[in-house]
From Swiss-Prot:
The lineage of its organism: Bacteria, Pseudomonadati, Aquificota, Aquificia, Aquificales. SUPFAM superfamilies: Ribosomal protein S10. One of its GO terms (cellular component) is small ribosomal subunit. Part of the 30S ribosomal subunit. Keywords: Ribonucleoprotein, Ribosomal protein. The gene is rpsJ. Involved in the binding of tRNA to the ribosomes. One of its GO terms (biological process) is translation. It comes from Aquifex aeolicus (strain VF5). This is Small ribosomal subunit protein uS10. It comes from the Bacteria. InterPro entries: Ribosomal_uS10, Ribosomal_uS10_CS, Ribosomal_uS10_dom, Ribosomal_uS10_dom_sf. Gene3D superfamilies: Ribosomal protein S10 domain (3.30.70.600).
Length: 104
């Protein structure tokens, strides 16, 4: 029989903000008696755009933009009811997207 675990996937455009949030979650889980596996860094998703600078002529003059999305996965292997309660009360920065799934 497989044991239940919680998988937390975090995404952000700023890697420092993301690492700070991961550290905060890990400290909370360890403080409440849980066991954490990770953080596992996922590949950075890069999106690029090429835009003409001028609205009419000068085709060779272009501007390039890039945005990077950083991701991390945390697996909480063993947890207590206090762990779940503490995770629900944690406040993370606005730029971090959190996705939580129960597995097992």
């Amino acid at each position: 029989m497989e044991q239940e675990k919680i998988r937390i996937k975090l995404r952000a455009y700023d890697h420092r903000l993301l690492d700070q949030s991961v550290k905060q979650i890990i400290e909370t889980v360890k403080r409440t008696g849980g066991v954490v596996k990770g953080p596992i860094p996922l590949p950075t998703r890069k999106r690029k755009w090429c835009v003409l600078r001028s609205p009419h002529k000068f085709d060779q003059s272009r501007e390039h933009f890039e945005i990077r999305e950083f991701s991390r996965i945390l697996d909480i292997i063993r947890f207590t009811p206090q762990t779940i309660e503490a995770l629900m009360e944690i406040s993370l920065p606005a730029g971090v997207d959190v996705e939580v799934k129960m597995r097992g």
